[in-house]
Amino acid sequence: MREVADEAVLPNLSSPTAAPPKTALGRWLRAGHRLDEADHSSTAPWGRVLWLTGVDYFSTLGYQPGIALLAAGALSPIATLILVAVTLLGAVPVYAQVARRSYAGQGSIAMLESLLRGWGGKLLVLALLGFAATDFVITMTLSAADAAQHAIENPLLAPYLGGHNVLLTLALLLGLTVVFLAGFEEALGVARAVVVPYLVLTLVVLARGLFEITLHPEVIARFRLDLAAHGDGTALLLAGALLFPRLALGLSGFETGVSVMPLVAGNPDDPRGGPPHGRIRATRKLLVSAALIMSVLLVLSSVVTTMLVPPAAYAEEGPAAGRAIAYLAHGLFGEVFGSIYDLWTIAILAFAGASAMTGLLHLLPRYMPRFGMAPQWTIYRRPMVLLLFTVCALVTLAFRADVEAQGGAYATGVLVLMLSAAFAVALELWREPRAGASGRGHAGRAWSLYFWIVTAVFAFTLIDNVVVRPEGVVIASLFVVGILTAAAASRFRRATELRVLTLRIEDPESRALWTRMVGKKVNLVPVRADYKIDGPLTFVHVTLVDNRSEFLAPLRVTVRQEDQDYVVEVAGATAIANTIAYVSELLDPVTLFLGLTGLSLMTQAFRYLLFGEGESGLMVYKILVRHWDATPEADVRPKIFLMSDSS
């Protein structure tokens, strides 16, 4: 028997997912904080989190210069300069706005979620989560595969590793998984230990390359002749602009930059309920710093590799293909230094998935469990890490650890997320003046127009990428379909949970009347009819929210008395049957009378799943039976009468 507390909000009913695990393995899997809640004890200064973001962003230096050479040849520096301009003038401002408006680690998807209500909004979010999963999962698998490829092409390691790309890739992914099973703090430490030496070694190679260029003026003369063959300055800029989308992988890292915001420490006085201004400022510093470091390295690497790497070397299957800086490290410093550089390139590529793993761990648990579209255990870190490793292992096996085969999907995922972010920011700024910001209305509109231009640039980049690499859309679509399928299956399976977030009794009179009803004192009746029964009746009226796609609901209850009977008004429900079942469990009535419509079960099932209506009487019975099976008690269950409306 349950007695009502004095507080207006009643304690939630127990559920099998809330029960503590009974085994040691279960306790280990659920250890640590929940991923759908902020953990203020696991934050670090933005300078430390920078390396976690940078482990993905900076790792593209392992293959980006080689891709630029293969795609643009002598025009690689021009195309790279345009890429840097798009980064600093487009991506950085966009994600600075995203950081201000979506500071809980949900990225630009949270901004777009509010554009559409109901199932349309849910489908939009799920589709974007599919592209985010494409971006982040392929980041992990492609980077690990490229690390394996670098190891196999190293002259010292090749005799021991040749021909085992897949096994080596899986081993590297397993190592990343072990780090994240240990915790986020360990991941931050490993990221810094990997990234800083890699950047120092890269700067050493590029500085030596620039020195070599100054010693050989003929290299500069040959480069100028190659540029002159493409026309004047206008022609070079136009050609570079057309080639720049092929370098789109150099834009990766920004979505993960905002998705790891929960790890960034803010000011001690940041409000818990409002915008954490200190964390937002720190994240903006992180984004700008990462972009500036990467921009300098991209420009230097494009100039050095274009002038010093011969075309035969960076052609497909050439010794510099996909590893132009590593090729120069061996050529300029010898095998010992070259192998050291290879080792750190392997390390940063192997750990490049760290920011992607962090992003997914902060992204998926904040959406899909809330939508009822993922099992409840996905809110815990260790089960999610193991799930993501399984997905990455399957992707690696499907692609046979082929770096080139995964490149199209990677670029597609990155560009779709950047396009959606730019679109969301432009739309938000366009709407703000209409919301009453009179003094800043014109400035807001001007910024909105600027971000619409940025949106157009990202749209052009995405379309060009899809035309050149259409297989990327196919692979990304498979991820989207996978997310949608898993979401639908989980929503169907979890539909018969109680689905109540909180229950608040609105006024003191209602609380007093509620207390009188609890504990085998009334007969619960969701519909009014003629009954011949002893004892008072409690009539339950349920009002549904407008957005029936929501999974959990905060209920508001008022109670009034009519003669010896009671009327319970429940507002804010997402499903009639689940709400009646929840109220029944709280009141613990003697008898529960339920109606049956006798209409098509198929139609009623769809009405229940999509709109919270349907054959409510039958569904109340099923929900209660499932709840009773999962939470056995010594209490006597109420008698349930299912009565057809036609009888």
Language-model region placement:
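Extracellular loop-to-transmembrane helix junctions
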Residues: A68-E113, G120-V125, T141-L173, P197, ...
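Membrane-interface "cap" regions at the ends of multi-pass membrane proteins
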Residues: R2-Y63, L112-S114, G118-L126, L237, ...
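Helix-loop-helix junctions that connect adjacent transmembrane segments
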Residues: V196, V200-S252, V467
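Cytosolic C-terminal regulatory domains/tails of membrane transporters and channels
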Residues: M1-A38, T496-S647
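C-terminal membrane-solvent junction of multi-pass transporters and transport-like membrane proteins
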Residues: P375-M384, M418-P470, L498-W514
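Transmembrane-helix boundary/entry motifs in multi-pass membrane transporters
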Residues: A38-D39, R48, A96-D135, L157-N165, ...
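Extracellular/periplasmic helix-exit of transmembrane alpha-helices
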Residues: A207-P217, G266-P276, V288-A324
